[in-house]
């Protein structure tokens, strides 16, 4: 199944091959060069490369690692069984083991996350923890303080370079898969979903079933803008808001939440932003 999915088939196994701003890449490369990974909390939107980087670090250094999806296994039983059992045993290679917890912001903040804090101290000699999350506000502060926190957030000046790098990578993948493509259409797909690299590849693979990536798919590529939603909310026009939700209900909800989250500083008073973040975190 993994080989069938392009996101897995073409997943980078080295930090040098990951599409990241240079400042992030140099930080992760320094871990590889030292062959030592600290506890990490990688934060950012879906598909921005957090899990890819975590796995590439382990692959390149040669660490044994365990993958856990926090959204599927969020309860304390996961800690008592998988996490604690794995962290307490010695690596077959003699080096440190790594536990990668994907979507750690879904771990129970009242039971599993506090237990994680104790485990990070108890097994520090034997095991490193790498957590990824979409919203760092959902991670308790004691875990923040025990990790190097790295936010996968692109600066304005980095966006064109990263988009071009992924455009090049997507072109190489389509060529390798022998899928004919129109470069202008590919650019539209990248533009719509950037910086969600995973979504771009999944969409390209879905569109490729027709045999090619050309103007025939453009009707499906139209981007979702939240400007109309924001205007409706400001005007308290709840009829228009319900209409917007009905028209865009098929979109990925996490992606929509992320768009709203990223726009807060542009559309809200600064004093209201903390309450909005807490409200979004509930969903």
Protein language model regions, located:
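Short amphipathic alpha-helix in the helical subdomain of ABC transporter nucleotide-binding domains
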Residues: 72, 79, 159, 163-166, ...
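The catalytic "switch" region of P-loop NTPases
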Residues: 142-176
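AAA+ P-loop NTPase domains with strong preference for DNA replication initiators
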Residues: 22, 164-283
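P-loop/Walker A NTP-binding region and its immediately flanking N-terminal helices
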Residues: 1-156, 205
């Amino acid at each position: 199944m993994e080989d069938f999915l392009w996101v897995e088939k073409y997943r980078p196994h080295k930090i040098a091959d990951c599409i990241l701003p240079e400042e992030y890449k140099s930080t992760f490369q320094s871990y590889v060069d030292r062959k030592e990974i600290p506890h990490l909390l990688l934060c950012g939107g879906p598909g921005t490369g957090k899990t890819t980087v975590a796995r590439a670090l382990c692959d390149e250094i040669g660490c044994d690692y365990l993958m856990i999806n926090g959204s599927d296994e969020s309860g304390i039983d996961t800690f008592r069984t998988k996490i604690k059992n794995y962290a307490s045993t010695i690596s077959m290679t003699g080096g440190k083991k790594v536990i990668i917890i994907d979507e750690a912001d879904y771990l129970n903040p009242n039971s599993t996350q506090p237990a994680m804090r104790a485990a990070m101290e108890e097994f520090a000699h034997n095991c490193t923890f790498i957590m990824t999350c979409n919203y760092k506000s959902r991670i308790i502060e004691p875990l923040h303080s025990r990790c190097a926190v790295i936010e996968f957030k692109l600066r304005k000046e980095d966006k064109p370079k990263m988009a071009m790098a992924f455009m090049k990578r997507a072109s190489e993948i389509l060529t390798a898969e022998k899928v004919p493509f129109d470069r202008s259409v590919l650019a539209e797909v990248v533009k719509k979903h950037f910086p969600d690299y995973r979504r771009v590849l999944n969409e390209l693979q879905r569109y490729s079933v027709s045999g090619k990536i050309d103007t025939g798919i453009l009707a499906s590529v139209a981007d979702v803008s939240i400007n109309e939603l924001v205007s409706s909310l400001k005007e308290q026009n709840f009829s228009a808001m319900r209409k917007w939700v009905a028209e865009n209900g098929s979109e990925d909800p996490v992606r929509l939440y992320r768009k709203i989250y990223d726009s807060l500083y542009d559309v809200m008073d600064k004093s209201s932003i903390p309450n909005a973040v807490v409200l979004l975190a509930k969903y």
